Amino acid sequence: MSDSAWQAVTHENCGNVKGPFYHGTKYDLEIGQLLVPGFVSNFEEGRVSNNVYFTALLEPAIWGAELSTSLTGAEGRGYIYIVEPTGTFEDDPNLTNKRFPGNITQSYRTRQPLKIVGKVNDWTGHAPEVLQQMIDGLKEKMRNGLAVIED
């Protein structure tokens, strides 16, 4: 899709976006469980997240699993689930139109539950040095007050 063809995903038109959708996390969950907002953020200490975040691409879900695990000091590499939105959703404003125009990561957020319908077991994480680079970059942004989450 070219930049000129990109159209924002809103609560009104999100039905046009087709999955599968993925959610990466540090939590070992069960198929059938609902992911709901209102829990402590994995990315900002002391913040309660008003949204649940998900993506139509596996790569951002891998980052979600690895970062939520690493940033909170949890064991393991994290988990990736196949999820279905139960309500409307919109582009994740934390990634959309930031470094690149549009929503190239196909990342979304919702205030409605996501239902876990499957688990991705066969995924390859990032090399340790690549993951550490990302963590160092995020921590630097946090120190400089630049890692504000729009929730």
Could you tell me what each predicted segment is?
Residues 26, 33-34, 74-151:
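Active-site and NAD+-binding cores of ADP-ribose-processing enzymes
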Residues 58-72:
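Short active-site loop/helix that positions an aromatic residue
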Residues 42, 72-75:
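Solvent-exposed, non-transmembrane amphipathic alpha-helical segments
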Residues 1-51, 66-67:
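ADP-ribose/NAD+-binding catalytic cleft of ART/PARP-like enzymes
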